Amino acid sequence: MSKAYTGGCACGAIRYEITADPVFSNDCQCRDCQRESGTGHQSHLTFPRQNVTLAGVGRPWEMVADSGVRKTRYFCPTCGSPVYLTFSSMPQFFAIRAASLDEPSRYKPQAVTYTSGGYEWDHLDPALPKFEKMPPR
């Protein structure tokens, strides 16, 4: 890893620093991500939880994903920005929204997931591997 990944919410009440490279980066087209983002997909980077330093407390929203995995999405209680996610069945991982990065250009997607929910108007990199659901682990 060259340098830490840093970012947070729009108002600065939540900040993170991550001292590892992402284990997975994806554009997700599931219906939950579409609803939360207000567009056709959401972009995530997933990291080892042990390498994350978090300042500030997000407001949690717990839900069951299309995959059946229980996840908690965290939003800034002040500005409402969606910032990060955790997974009760995979506590070793911590995912952030690509747009929450201080340098969003560092986001390099590896795949498009939940293409079964995608729309023709949501144009993503055609060279990326595509999965109707999540890729096999």
Task: Name the predicted role of every residue range.
Residues 1-137:
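A short Gly-Trp-Pro
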